[in-house]
C-alpha cells in the first residue's frame, strides 16, 4: 500500500511548526495510519543533508551573498528535488506517511507572487523538482497578514521574513489563491494552538484521501 503525503502551508507565523509537533504526537495513534506504518516529519527547505546546506544559504547567507530571485528559485527547486527523491518517495513506497512543513505551494506563493517570477516558469521547474508528486492533503493555516506580523515581532527574522509588509501581503494573497485553486483544507490559524489542532484533526478524520483502501 502506498503511503500518504501531508503538507502544512501558510505564511510565516501561522503556527506550522507547533501544529507539526502536535500532529506527530496524534497521527500514529489516530486510527488513520495503517498498522506498521511510520510517520516521517520533514520540512522545506532542509529535509535532507543537501537541503540543510541550501537552507542556510537561502535564509542566512553570508554578507553580500544573498541570491537573486532567479537563483533563489533554483535553490528551492534543488532542495525539493533532493527531498522528493531521497526522502519522500522512498518513504511513501514503503507505505509510510510523510508530514512536511511546506512543499511546492510555498514556491508559487513566495517566488511567484512575492518575487513576481513567471508562474509558467515556476510550474515547469516544479514538474522536474516534484517528479509529479502531489500531496494527498494540504492543510493551509489561514492567518491574516496583520496577525502574522504581530506574531513575528517576538522572534528573530530570517532573510525571507525580513522582506517587508508589501512582499508578505503578496505572499498571503498568493496562498489564498492557491488554496482556492487546489482545494486545500483551510484551517483558521488565529485560534489557540489547541483549537487549531482540533480543527486539523476533524479535517483529517473526514478527508476522503486518507481513508484506507
Swiss-Prot record:
It comes from the Bacteria. InterPro entries: P-loop_NTPase (IPR027417), Thymidylate_kin-like_dom (IPR039430), Thymidylate_kin_CS (IPR018095), Thymidylate_kinase (IPR018094). Disulfide bonds: none annotated. Phosphorylation of dTMP to form dTDP in both de novo and salvage pathways of dTTP synthesis. The keyword Kinase applies. Gene3D superfamilies: P-loop containing nucleotide triphosphate hydrolases. ATP binds at residues 10-17. One of its GO terms (molecular function) is dTMP kinase activity. It is an enzyme of class 2 (transferase). Its EC number is 2.7.4.9. It catalyses: dTMP + ATP = dTDP + ADP. The gene is tmk. GO terms for cellular component: cytosol. Pfam families: Thymidylate_kin (PF02223). One of its GO terms (biological process) is dTDP biosynthetic process. This is Thymidylate kinase. Signal peptide: none annotated. Belongs to the thymidylate kinase family. It comes from Synechococcus sp. (strain WH7803). Keywords: ATP-binding, Kinase, Nucleotide biosynthesis, Nucleotide-binding, Transferase. The keyword ATP-binding applies.
